[in-house]
């Protein structure tokens, strides 16, 4: 039975093979592929025709809409305001034609411009329609000028945005890359390089005002100074920069200057040698200024710094430190009494001579008695060295019955009532530099130092004189926008904050 089944299967396979052969014979024969080298030249390189891609049909509801930002100004953008601008009489006077304003007639053609105007928190799109006028003689053809509050020279941003970028970077210690991220969250894509250009352009415009403020500060009778450092991103130039502030408390003016290397000669430039006093916190470069030839200012050292040194001794020499702190507190009580009673300079000086002088002598007596017994390199020894100078010089002068030079600098405030007993006003103004170190860590390059110093000078003067810096900057940019060259001195004096 198995043999019979096998023979039947073999027969079926043969029948199927014959049927397949018949089907294959009926099919057309396949063309053999010939290599390109055997083909004729006309058939070797045939231009390949690309198939045209059919555009996808999109529903009208799903069409991509333009972002509501001023950086893609097209027909889909929402216009917030429309202004119609006309030719002014000043334009007619500046033209070469001798025709009067009444001789000009309007032309039907109008130019349209779109501007991005910064309003606190967002941009507003303003569309301007510029009217055109032509004189009867046909020599001049005038077009309405864009107002200064909409656009600045060589910039597509308005003065308000320039002022906002400057204040965020200088006063709010907000680096440019953070400003870029903040604007991106609001829906505006502005690069860091663009923000940097706006900052430098703002500093270039207000540079004459900053120089005028520094010139006035250097002539002050009493000058408060202090310095700080900030790192530089470019290590090839230098690693650190010194930024110094000079304050005229009487006129509420301050001037910032920066140096790559801070020397006594550099600092001497900052103050007029005909002035009387300069206040500082016993920095070595300031003390060297007293030995420069032709320098006439007397140095007054800050008692608040001496008080901090004494305060650090409370854990180690409690009774000694508390005794000195109470005496320094009495000095401040004398100043507070004179301020509350609005005493004149003469009466204020008499009060210092009668009370403060005796207190300073008692402080000197306690410090000189403990100097010899203090252990070298201890905190007590370093505090007395800060007040009286080195021990060798002090011992030589004490034998002669003279007082050290450093202590005489601490007592300079007894000579004139205009001198404050501390240097806190300049330290408060320099506090922003510490904020910069926490937020941005460094400044980009050495060339950017005058940019920051100029902006610091004008903005901190606004704070001293209780002037809104944002509104002041906008007003200055609008007024100086029309000047191509440097403005005259009269206008610069009027634009100083508070004038």
Protein language model regions, located:
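Short, flexible loop/hinge motifs at secondary-structure junctions
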Residues: 1-153, 224-225, 355-356, 360
């Amino acid at each position: 039975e198995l043999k019979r089944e096998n023979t039947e299967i073999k027969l079926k396979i043969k029948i199927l093979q014959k049927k397949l052969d018949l089907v294959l014979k009926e099919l057309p024969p396949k063309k053999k592929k010939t290599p390109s080298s055997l083909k004729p030249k006309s058939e070797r390189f045939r231009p390949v025709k690309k198939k045209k891609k059919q555009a996808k049909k999109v529903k009208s509801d799903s069409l991509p809409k333009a972002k509501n930002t001023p950086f893609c100004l097209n027909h889909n953008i929402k216009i917030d305001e429309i202004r119609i601008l006309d030719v002014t009489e000043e334009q007619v006077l500046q033209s070469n034609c001798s025709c009067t304003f009444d001789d000009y007639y309007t032309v039907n053609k109008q130019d349209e411009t779109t501007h991005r105007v910064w309003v606190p928190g967002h941009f507003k799109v303003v569309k301007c329609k510029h009217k055109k006028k032509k004189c009867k003689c046909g020599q001049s053809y005038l077009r309405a000028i864009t107002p200064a509050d909409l656009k600045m020279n060589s910039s597509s941003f308005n003065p308000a945005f320039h002022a906002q970028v400057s204040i965020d970077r200088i006063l709010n210690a907000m680096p440019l890359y953070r400003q870029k991220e903040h604007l991106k969250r609001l829906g505006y894509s502005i690069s860091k390089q663009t923000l940097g250009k706006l900052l430098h352009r703002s500093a270039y415009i207000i540079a004459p005002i900053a120089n005028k403020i520094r010139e006035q500060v250097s002539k002050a009778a009493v000058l408060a100074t202090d310095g700080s450092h900030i790192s530089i991103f470019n290590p090839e130039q230098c690693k650190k920069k010194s930024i110094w502030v000079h304050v005229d408390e009487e006129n509420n003016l301050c001037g910032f200057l920066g140096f790559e290397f801070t020397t006594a000669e550099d600092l001497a430039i900052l103050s007029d040698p005909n002035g009387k006093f300069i206040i500082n916190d016993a920095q070595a470069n300031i003390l060297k200024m007293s030995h420069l030839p032709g320098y006439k200012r007397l140095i007054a050292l800050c008692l608040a710094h001496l008080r901090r040194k004494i305060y650090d001794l409370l854990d180690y020499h409690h009774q000694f430190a508390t005794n000195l702190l109470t005496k320094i507190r009495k000095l401040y009580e004398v100043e507070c009494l004179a301020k509350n009673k609005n005493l004149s300079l003469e009466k204020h000086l008499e009060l210092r001579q009668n009370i403060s002088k005796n207190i300073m002598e008692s402080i000197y007596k306690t410090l000189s008695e403990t100097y010899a017994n203090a252990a070298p390199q201890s905190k007590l020894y370093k505090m007395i060295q800060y007040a009286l100078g080195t021990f060798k010089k002090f011992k030589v002068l004490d034998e002669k019955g003279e007082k050290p030079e450093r202590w005489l600098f601490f007592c300079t405030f007894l000579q004139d009532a205009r001198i404050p007993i501390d240097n806190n006003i300049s330290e408060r103004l320099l506090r922003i530099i510490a904020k910069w170190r926490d937020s941005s860590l460094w400044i980009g390059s050495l060339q950017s130092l005058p940019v920051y110093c100029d902006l610091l000078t004008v903005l901190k003067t606004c704070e001293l004189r209780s002037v809104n810096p944002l509104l002041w900057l906008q007003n200055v940019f609008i007024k100086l926008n029309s000047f191509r060259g440097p403005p005259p001195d009269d206008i610069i004096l009027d634009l100083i904050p508070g004038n």
